[in-house]
Amino acid sequence: MTKTGEAEGDMIGLGSRVTPEKINFMTKHARGLLCISIGREIAERLELPQMWQENTDPFGTAFTVSVDYKTTTTGISAYDRATTIKALVDPEAKPEDFFKPGHCFPLVAKDGGVLERNGHTEASVTLARLAGEAEVAYICEILKEDGHMARRPEFEYRIEPYGKGVCE
């Protein structure tokens, strides 16, 4: 959750530790749009252009063109999305290894992290960096049962049964 940013809860996982089971859990229980936060250097190395030249998103979320890894089938299954995320983590991956557009939505974090932009993209990449992992994380907004955004304390109730914590 960000205090001055989007004021919503996201589930976050490290890209280096992704599994199909974790993707399935997140999409089932968080229910929002699954995205992949990445550092700018990864976006540049993989030649992932911004989705739109002039970003008019009020929060400044930096979506790139969507991607699927070249070995995936439809791209949408938890297995295919985990495969794509693992490929984004791989330092040997090349731009031609990805189909564009795809079913995974990379978001580019600001270099200054949460000090530059107080968003879930930057928070998740910062967490990956602090863990000594590649600057790749997967995130998903937490929705209420009725489909509206879960705000605190609602999102805490959604994650509490699973032993997940809150980081502000």
Residue ranges and their predicted role:
Residues 1-167:
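Catalytic domains of riboflavin
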